[in-house]
Regions:
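N-terminal phosphate-binding or glycine-rich loops at protein starts, especially the Walker A/P-loop
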Residues: 2-55
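Glycine-rich oxoanion-binding loops at beta->alpha junctions
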Residues: 2-5, 54-108, 117-118, 145, ...
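Short glycine-rich or small-residue beta-strand-to-loop segments that form or flank ligand, phosphate
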Residues: 10-20, 76-82, 108-114, 186-191, ...
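Short, ordered loop/turn segments at secondary-structure junctions
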Residues: 16-18, 44-49, 82-83, 115-116, ...
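Short glycine/serine/threonine-rich phosphate/pyrophosphate-binding segments
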Residues: 20-30, 51-52, 94-96, 116-124, ...
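Accessory alpha-helical/coil subdomains and C-terminal extensions
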Residues: 41, 101, 112-114, 120-135, ...
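C-terminal non-catalytic interaction/assembly regions of soluble proteins
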Residues: 258-422
Length: 422
């Protein structure tokens, strides 16, 4: 007998992995779209862990104004986590616990807002729901500053970190140029991007031409060549008087080792990186004798809502609304993907894409986006990147500071035994 498609029940929304400057805009899109359809929305506290622990938040307790303010508030309003569910075969009990929580609270739609691993989780839950004959519609909602999700043209969160990176590169370069005659000759900016160089590439928007910063971009898609790197830095300083380098955290040597491998791994099994910028700085100082300054923006690059891209904020909100539309239309195991229809003028739309084509896949920077010398971006990369950082989306301010919302996050009463048991 086929599983009945639910026409009533609750929607559960959860945030996963590293947060962004605009992930809360997606949350606002989800809540507002669901409210418009009369569907109650619960949020999982701290991502999938909240669902497992039955730590749910009733968003109906939030005012319309508070939900609207999420559109300009960075961070994750309901909390996020780095917790990867194992395979169904390795730990079926966790997935069954999720279905148990869903059943107890009449959750009929599950929206998981994250990256590659989150898409995989949503896909697996949809499969188990069918196996357990529980009617649950699972939708992956795109989010990652790394911009490495397959199928979608870009990922909400990326446009804003790209803008932050380009602006920081431009402004820091003006500082270095001012000091170069008697002080710092080389500035190194380390940006996120373990395997894909999208964020590093965005630094290239800061300038164009042989002598414009950044003078070198180091991509994880390329093998790091120490001799070529040092030669390029030396030639740039001798010609321009100073040099700006932007390096992805994930660059590797010819042996395949991360330059900044700290020897530890996170909850997703990813290698923890200890710092490319200081490693490169020591190399330049030791081999070339130049004074070097380096910077690691870390969380700053993904939380700078004051410098968010308007396009990014709009897309983040739109995928939230589209995810609800997909779920309530009865779709399952899909993700609302952004489709570019034109570069100039920039136009885009949203289409549902199967999670099976997204889960655990990684979209790296195309070879055609990296200059032949390996240290810069091409015109094709500029055409792709430029629209994504366009427009301003500044939050309201008071006394010189941005005004951000803090939700009530009222807990839903638990109905089940604690997890993990015992």
């Amino acid at each position: 007998m086929p599983t009945r498609h639910a026409t009533s029940g609750r929607l559960l929304y959860a945030q996963s992995g590293g947060v962004t400057a605009v992930i809360n805009a997606t949350a606002a899109g989800v809540i507002e779209a669901a409210r418009a359809r009369g569907v109650p929305v619960y949020a999982a506290r701290n991502g999938i862990l909240g669902a497992l622990r039955e730590e749910l938040i009733d968003t109906r307790k939030e005012t319309r104004a508070a939900v609207a303010a999420l559109r300009h508030t960075p961070g994750g309003a309901f909390g996020s986590c780095r917790y990867k569910l194992k395979s169904l075969e390795a730990n079926r009990a966790e997935y069954e616990r999720l279905i148990e929580v869903f059943r107890a609270h009449d959750i009929r739609w599950f929206l998981y807002n994250g990256g590659n691993d989150s898409a995989d989780t949503a896909l697996k839950i949809s499969q188990l729901g069918k196996a357990m004959k529980y009617d649950i519609r699972c939708i992956g909602v795109p989010k990652t500053v790394d911009n490495d999700l397959a199928v979608t043209d870009c990922c909400p969160g990326f446009g804003s970190v790209a803008k932050y990176t380009a602006v920081s590169t431009l402004e820091a370069s003006l500082d270095v140029a001012s000091m170069a005659s008697t002080s710092t000759k080389v500035f190194i900016l380390e940006v996120m991007g373990r395997h894909a160089g999208w964020i590093a590439a965005a630094a290239g928007l800061a300038g164009d031409g042989a002598d414009a910063p950044p003078h070198l971009i180091l991509f994880p898609e390329n093998v790091f060549d120490e001799a070529a790197f040092l030669a390029k830095v030396k030639a740039t300083v001798e010609r321009v008087g100073w040099c700006t380098v932007v390096a992805s955290e994930g660059i590797r040597n010819a042996a395949g080792q991360f330059l900044a491998d700290a020897g530890t791994r996170d909850a997703f099994g990813h290698v923890q990186l200890g710092g490319v910028a200081p490693t490169l700085a020591e190399l330049v100082k030791g081999k070339l004798g130049y004074k070097v300054h380096w910077a690691l923006p870390d969380y700053l690059q993904r939380s700078a809502r004051h410098l968010a891209s308007r396009v990014d904020a709009e897309q983040a909100y739109a995928v939230g609304k589209a995810a609800v539309a997909c779920a309530l239309a009865g779709m399952n195991a899909v993700m609302p993907a952004i489709v570019r229809t034109s570069d100039a003028p920039y136009r885009w739309k949203i289409e549902a894409a199967p999670l099976a084509k997204i889960a655990n896949r990684e979209k790296k920077l195309p070879k055609g986006f990296i200059r032949k010398d390996g240290f810069g971006i091409t015109a094709a990369a500029r055409r792709y990147l430029a629209p994504l950082i366009a427009g301003e989306s500044a939050p309201p301010t008071k006394n010189g500071l941005p005004v951000y919302v803090q939700l009530k996050n009222v807990a839903v009463a638990k109905k089940l035994a604690p997890w993990p048991p015992g």
